[in-house]
Amino acid sequence: MNIAEFHQNIEHVWQKIEEELENQGADVDCETQGSVFTITFDNRTQIVINKQEPLLELWIASKLGGFHFAFKNGEWVSNDGQRFWDCFVEACAAHGENVQF
């Protein structure tokens, strides 16, 4: 994956997150500033998802901790094999929103 594809892929992830959270009625605010996408929940807690361009990785930080994902075989996967979307759903639940992706 080249740099342009990396950015396009992550921006697609961010767009999907924002659209699905809205469609599912989640009480959140989403904001993008540069390479950082922040989801603020009704209880004022946050999930932060950011691009790590030098490593071509997607990072997520939440109440559950920090996780790093690389794009492998068409999806974002951590070193231990966890899929990004599974991690994201678990993180949302930890912040008080039950969503499906």
Swiss-Prot record:
| Gene3D superfamilies in the record | Frataxin/CyaY
InterPro entries xref list:
CyaY, Frataxin/CyaY, Frataxin/CyaY_sf, Frataxin_CS
Q: Which residues cross the membrane?
A: none
Its GO biological process terms? iron-sulfur cluster assembly
Q: Does the keyword Iron apply?
A: yes
Its Gene Ontology cellular component terms are: cytosol
Highest taxon of source: Bacteria
Q: Name one GO molecular function term.
A: ferric iron binding
Alphabetical UniProt keywords: Iron, Metal-binding
UniProt-listed PROSITE patterns: FRATAXIN_1 (PS01344), FRATAXIN_2 (PS50810)
Keyword Metal-binding tagged: yes
A Pfam family the protein falls into = Frataxin_Cyay
* Stated family: Belongs to the frataxin family.
Role according to the record: Involved in iron-sulfur (Fe-S) cluster assembly. May act as a regulator of Fe-S biogenesis.
UniProt xrefs under NCBIfam families: FeS_CyaY (TIGR03421)
Q: What is this protein called?
A: Iron-sulfur cluster assembly protein CyaY
